[in-house]
């Protein structure tokens, strides 16, 4: 059973571009991928594909076909977004899967992805523009100590510790610490 990276995907583009990009994620639909369409390996959305597409289309205020908008959603990745979208799975299953770079260039979208992998305690930040240029950074999660029970837990830099609960006691007050 792999560790999971969970995070936020923000995609900017035209209606057709965003729709195509969302269609590349494995979903709860049956079938879970669109037959004949290359998809993101081990990259999941936790809902029916059309629900995400309908929500994304509601972000467009202009009726013009070439109008652009942004849409953000939650996704999960087996091991890491890097291994699912950049290097690893896509190369091993190239006839079925594609890289983030290929998808952004084909769909004409730009993307920002932030993930947190709490099992191995790292976070990722990935950007890809509509030409397929990818930038990826990763770093250790930040450690916090619960003020109530002393439990050490980790959060990503994009997560607000005031919005988190201690996995041990459920308290919501933390202090930054150096321990992991």
Where are these regions (language model features)?
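Short linker/helix segments within small regulatory modules
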Residues: 155-165
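Short functional micro-motifs and their immediate structural scaffolds
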Residues: 154, 173-177
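The −1 position to Zn-ligating cysteines in a subset of zinc-ribbon hairpins
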Residues: 145, 165-168
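Short coil/turn motifs at beta-sheet boundaries
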Residues: 2-4, 66-68, 159
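Cys/His-coordinated zinc-binding microdomains
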Residues: 150, 170-173
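Short, extreme N-terminal segment that most often corresponds to the first beta-strand
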Residues: 1-33
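Charged interaction segments
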Residues: 25-28, 34-150, 178-180
């Amino acid at each position: 059973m792999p560790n999971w990276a969970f995070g936020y995907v923000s995609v900017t583009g035209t209606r057709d571009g965003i729709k195509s990009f969302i269609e590349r994620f494995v979903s709860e639909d049956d079938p879970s991928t669109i037959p004949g369409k290359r998809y993101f390996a081990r990259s999941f959305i936790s809902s029916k594909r059309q629900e995400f597409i309908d929500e994304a289309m509601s972000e467009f205020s202009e009726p013009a076909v070439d109008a652009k908008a942004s849409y953000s959603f939650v996704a999960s990745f087996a091991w890491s977004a890097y291994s699912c979208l950049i290097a690893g799975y896509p190369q091993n299953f190239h006839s079925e899967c594609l890289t983030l770079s290929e998808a952004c260039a084909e769909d004409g979208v730009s993307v920002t992805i932030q993930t947190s992998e709490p099992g191995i305690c790292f976070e990722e930040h990935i950007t890809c523009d509509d030409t397929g240029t990818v930038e990826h950074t990763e770093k250790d999660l930040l450690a916090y100590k619960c003020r109530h029970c002393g439990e050490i837990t980790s959060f990503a830099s994009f997560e607000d510790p005031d919005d988190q609960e201690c996995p041990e006691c459920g308290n919501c007050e933390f202090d930054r610490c150096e321990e992991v």
